Amino acid sequence: MSDSTPKTPRGFVVHTAPVGLADDGRDDFTVLASTAPATVSAVFTRSRFAGPSVVLCREAVADGQARGVVVLARNANVATGLEGEENAREVREAVARALGLPEGEMLIASTGVIGRQYPMESIREHLKTLEWPAGEGGFDRAARAIMTTDTRPKEVRVSVGGATLVGIAKGVGMLEPDMATLLTFFATDARLDPAEQDRLFRRVMDRTFNAVSIDTDTSTSDTAVLFANGLAGEVDAGEFEEALHTAALALVKDIASDGEGAAKLIEVQVTGARDDAQAKRVGKTVVNSPLVKTAVHGCDPNWGRVAMAIGKCSDDTDIDQERVTIRFGEVEVYPPKARGDQADDALRAAVAEHLRGDEVVIGIDLAIADGAFTVYGCDLTEGYVRLNSEYTT
């Protein structure tokens, strides 16, 4: 992976505009497209209430070719019936037509409030004047335009060989992806073998976006896409996978630390599991525990809540509490040792000091085998409750 300052990938253009989805008049409509043919890899939500955007995208990426995506923020267009499906098709078709592309090469993604129709009159008015954007780049504008309750845009750039990879993402709530993420779009001018591109993309997504959880709620609109137009030539697949992992992990940490009302990033490192799947399961159980989340928020060195959360994995009968080790940062808190009152006070003080940081690391060694997985989340605050209790009001 190159250390040079990454630039914009060749051949990608961005258009953003306000079309009435957002109440504050900000840009809420985004088109990201490649001027050259591109291969595409994508993963989507497994929600049984998936929106029409997800359904249309699944169909479009089946042949591994796509040139772009239109993103509508502040309206999920989910649970909107036949009208919502027809509106999604109309928007996608109109964008493709404006750019002179086959409809099947344009994807569509939506995010925001569920159960509301698109404001089609204002969208149609904007689509009448849509054309290819002038000049390459604009990913920073796209990262901002796709936001909903995010407090900041999320963008990352990485150089790999002679190519550039850019990633943007949104999402801070309703976030526990299942083979997808919230909305994440990667664009690269690297040339990749389509089959290998798909394999490495799925591997990276599983280790990054599928490892983050804010509130255990899986979105109906989760979509992650990688476009590769090849204008920079071939790159080593292994190097590209490393670059993609670096970019995706940076976005994951940014999402987790920007969780609705969040003040702290929580990283749970599970080792010594029977396999990686067990490690992931234990890590998710810990990072999703409201008691663990609130303890982290309050800097309360109540490490027993982590032990409680591990114990909830009752189907994992090979977990033996006498073999488990728990630590906060570098401070080992379990198994218990005969320390004396002063030593116990010092231990709690050391844990509390670690919890006062912006990033909290909880380490768990199950001492069963060599399975390992790291998951990411955030603390639970009054801000989360306030924001979600007033979301549509």
Curated annotation (Swiss-Prot):
What's its catalytic activity?
A: N(2)-acetyl-L-ornithine + L-glutamate = N-acetyl-L-glutamate + L-ornithine
**Residues in the active site?**
T181
The record's Pfam families line, in alphabetical order, gives:
ArgJ
Q: What are the site positions for Involved in the stabilization of negative charge on the oxyanion by the formation of the oxyanion hole?
A: T111, G112
Activity's sensitivity to pH is recorded as: Optimum pH is between 7.5-8.
Q: Mutating T181A has which effect?
A: No autoproteolysis; loss of activity
Binding annotation for substrate: T148, T149, K170, G171, V172, G173, T181, E260, N388, T393
Keyword Glycoprotein tagged: no
Pathway info = Antibiotic biosynthesis; clavulanate biosynthesis
Q: EC number(s) per UniProt? A: 2.3.1.35
Could you tell me what this protein does? Catalyzes the biosynthesis of ornithine by transacetylation between N(2)-acetylornithine and glutamate. It can also use L-arginine, L-glutamine and L-lysine as acetyl acceptors.
NCBIfam families noted in UniProt: ArgJ, PRK05388.1
Q: What else is on record for this protein? A: The role of this protein is probably directed towards producing increased intracellular concentrations of arginine for clavam biosynthesis, rather than primary metabolism.
Q: What is this protein called?
A: Glutamate N-acetyltransferase Oat2
